Amino acid sequence: MFNNKLFASIGIILVLSSCTNELCFMLTPRIRSIATVLFKLAGLVIATFVFILLMAQVWYDMSYDKPLSARGRVYVFERPTEHPDQPRPYEFWFTRPQIAALRGSSPDVEAVGTMDVDGILQDPRTGELLRETPAAMVDEDFVKVFPFDPLLGSVDGFGRPDAAIVCESAARHLFGSVEEAFGSTLNFYTTEDPTVCEIIAVCRDFPANCRLSNIGVYVPLGSLWEDKNDPNYEAFEAFVLLRKGASADAVLPLMAEAFEKNWVFWESNDTPPDIRERVRQRSRLVPLHDMHYDPADNGTGSRTRDGVLSAIAILFLACALLNLFNLSMAGLSFSVQGNCVRRIFGAERGRLLLKQVLSSLVLCLLAFGVALLLVKLLAGSSLASMLSVPLNAQTLAPVWAVCLAVLAVGAVLAVLFPAFYGASFQPSAVLKGRINLSGRGKNWRVGTLLFQFLLSYIFIATGWMIGVQNRYVSDFDLGFKTKDIDFAFTGIFSGRDPEVVRTVLLQDPDITDVTFANYVLLQDRVFYETRVVNGTTVRFAGLDVTPDFLDFFGLQIVQGRGFTEADGQRATGSYIVNEAFLRAYPAIHIGDPMEGMMTGSHGTEAQIIGVVRDFHFEDLHHPITPFAFYCSGEPSNPAAARYPCVAVQTVAGKAGEVAGRLPGILNELSAQQRQEGGARCTVMEETIARFYAGNDRESRLVRVSSTLSLLLALLGILGLIYLEVQTIRKSVAIRKLHGATLPDLLRLLSGKYLILSTVAFAISVPVSIWVIRWWLQQFAEQAAVPVWIFALAWLMVTGLTLLVVAVMAVYISRTNPATELRRE
């Protein structure tokens, strides 16, 4: 919900707006004219500002990866999973032999770029490992698929095993300048021993809205896993570039057939024919841009969000233009007399109409300029964090053009009817008395008022529901303990002996418990294992853990048993799977054998011994999928750490403090680790917050937009009420002569608006629920839609409307009946 400051701001703005609107019609003609222009300008500036912000985010998503797409020729090949009822029906990670088969499947395939982002850079100046600077291993085809633009050097020599390509920003960060970077060397770690690479090219940074924007260094993939064709080596992304004029529909069957022939199910080649047939028939080529909207690929785009933001932006401008129309109509009683006098003295009707249209266009241009200035100011403030899009001219230019065009056309249309209508009166008739709008004009006003009430309700309910959902996912019980827990990567060397790490960490008085795994429990990138169990091929995410891991996190066993210390000493391994695992593979049961998954090795015997209650190991945008914990006493590979990730339970409230000193403690455990550095730590609750940082930005953006849109709607309502008051002055004067009091005038003015508000509310409830349900589709876990958001929306809109009516009633009650009747 809105905070107290926001509510206070709304109240102040409404009061000031009410006073401004009153001044527009109570002051002298010149001052009233200036005030009216300022009032119109304020509404247009607010609407234009919000339109640019919202549509900037939409345009960012709509154009994502478009600079990389080679005019629509870049695709991602996806094949269906073995089981069609899985929450994630497609896979896009492949082995090197599978990618080679795709590359040779058709002459229309120009190149298939291969990428793996596993690897760590070493700072050439300090020697520290740069885990926060993403680097990628790619093949020669990759530089053919994507448009690298060299500033220095050339990418033609990337086939060398010791070559590297560095982007401009990474070059400045690592070496201080582009010139210093070119020709220099850096170390790239994929195993214990580094690869020394020479920088053969420094290229321009890729645009901010593409998947390569955060990768700073590219090194050759070489022969890594080139001959590995079992599912545990499906670790590479494949980007397909088709030749110009080639049809994706024609190429797809050839690629699917080539992939199916090179698809290996472990040691078994007797894959059921229906599965292989589904691979041939249901594989697909997905345009690169569409991957931005796929949460399985950690895509940050959301078509639901884009639809909601687009609707809000368009309706925002609609509200502002309706306000412009209503204020123009409200000012007719003043402007038409002046225009009639001008016509009597020879002014042409067409010139008067043109003047009003040009005035409206100038007003739009001024509003557009002020809105751009506000956007520029916002770009340098903390409020810019509400958007994931950089607020610069390169990103926003298309949005500016569309906004200016829509604003100009809308503003012209908004003043045309009042201008033509005002010019339709005969000067002699106008100068003899006051004008009244036609019945159709009154019906239009009622319809406009109903529409703005409706928008107000929808905006408020939707904005509050987004806040409800964000609090729901932030506070949602993931199924395991998250409070006061740190996760640390021990480093390559310190993590080789977990018991030494345990002993040292438990000496810290702020640390109460420690456990180990090969990766974090709450994952932003999921790595899948594939096994064959009783003839059934299973695919699941998993962790290799110590026996105390499940107890540490409070994970509940619902069938079978949990791990024991004996399991951690046996040469054969043990599995505990989640409930989703058994739902996905109903033919598998406790006691069934399944090949082990010790870090750095596989092929050992293991058995499923228990089932753990389902828990969320990803953010709540993803459904719960099959997961397995593995534990064994197998000897570790001496060259690698089996459990490089340590989870630490801290004293209440100490997680952040412990996280700050934990990397230093871990780096000191080994002389090699002390030299290399690399240990790092995260607070689990902060990790959860980062998962929903995008949703939090979205929530704040929509709530601010909803607040401003409500303000615009209320200002429009204020203008309509004032117009209504102008048309019933004579009736009010007669009632006052017959003894009508202020409460009588309140009842006279408020009845119709209460009915309109209630009718709009009744219409808005199902519409709001539909919008809310549409938006909630992006979440696997959804909060219930509370009734109070609709009740408070009705109270808020109706209360503010009655407040406006009360202000107008007080104003009109102070008029002199005799003066009003004499004017009539």
Regions found by a protein language model. Give the residues of each.
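Generic structural signal for small/hydrophobic residues in well-ordered secondary structure
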Residues: D61, F77, L102, V143, ...
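Hydrophobic alpha-helical transmembrane segments of multi-pass inner-membrane transport and secretion
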Residues: S9-V15, R32-D61, G301-Q337, L365, ...
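Mid-to-C-terminal secondary-structure elements
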Residues: D139-L152, A164-G301, T503-G694
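Interfacial "coupling" helices/loops that link adjacent transmembrane helices in transporter permeases
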Residues: L322-L361, G716-L754, T815-N816
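Membrane-proximal extracellular/periplasmic loop immediately following the first transmembrane helix
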Residues: F51-I120, E226, Y233-V240, L252-P253, ...
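Alpha-helical transmembrane segments of integral membrane proteins
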Residues: F2-V45, D294-N298, S328-L354, L358-L361, ...
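Membrane-helix entry/capping segments
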Residues: N4-I10, T28-L38, L68, E260-A313, ...
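Small-residue-rich transmembrane alpha-helices
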Residues: L53, R284-V286, S360-F425, V468, ...
